[in-house]
Amino acid sequence: MKILDADAWMAALMAAPRPGADKILAFYDARVDAVCRDARCLLLPLDDHMCHRGDALFESLCYREGRIFALEEHLARLRDGSRALSLLPPCSWDELRARILDVARASGTDHGDIRVLVGRGPGGFGVSPEECPQSSLYIVALRKALPTEAFYEKGLTAFASAIPPKQEYLARIKSTNYLPNVFMAAEARQRGMDVAVTFDEDGHLGEAAIANVGIVDAEGRLCCPEGRRILPGTSMLAARKIAPQRLPVVERPIRREEIFTAREMLLFTSASLCVGISHFEGRPIGQGPDAGRPGPVARGLRDALLEHMLATGTPF
């Protein structure tokens, strides 16, 4: 086995295959305190507790037409997680916000996704945060194709996951410890469906792997699960804010059997805003001739959310 010096190592590393490089537009690394556009340089120290312990926070943002959606809401949730984990970023919150805008500008495109990751930092392979003298910060701008009209018109298929909801003390922290979510994504692939959805021990609706879900119930109300064992996403919260102009909104436990009598089932994400779920466990959602197709609330909320987020998004 060869033993390389630093120059030879870096040359070999830069020449090695880099899957996913085409998706990375620009990134910031607090260790260097600069932005780079070469995906080969996007590297994480293996002894950062983010890597081997999941001791880190992250946020997924999207930007459209040169505006970052819900930036302040994402930062507020990151601060909440920071308090819960006693994990501060290696800069001030104002500086972190400015770095996000810097990376968005450096992406060279007016639409894409952004990931913000705050880790415990490098320092060892133990579990105690005390061995990490400085936290880490990475901000990455990603290439992201906009959802097509065909995607929205077709809708999504969903099913009840075998994975239980996260425990209450973990559910509201957006950490990088995402193994249950990975299991849910694997379930969906194995079953040939789009979305796995959790249910608690009492049969109440939880969330999808990387999205919130809700229903338009038989009475025509937008119903969202209680926030006790889910992570309320920025798109769902925005939908609850603007939806009362269209229909009543309630937050309450949603029983699994209600899905089969619901008018619509909805999925909320930062990237696609609001998408109708057309089938659950192989059965069409909705009643009458329009059953099994995304309904008017899904379409209306998607348009309203896009309008709201473009109007309130942070320009860069």
Each PLM stretch: what is its role?
Residues 1-90, 98-102, 128-316:
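Helix-start/capping segments and mature chain N-termini
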Residues 92-101, 111-126:
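Short, glycine/charge-rich beta-strand/loop segments that flank catalytic centers
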Residues 104-108:
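Phosphate/pyrophosphate-binding loops at sites that engage ATP/ADP/AMP, CoA/4′-phosphopantetheine
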Residues 109-113, 193-194:
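Short secondary-structure junction motifs
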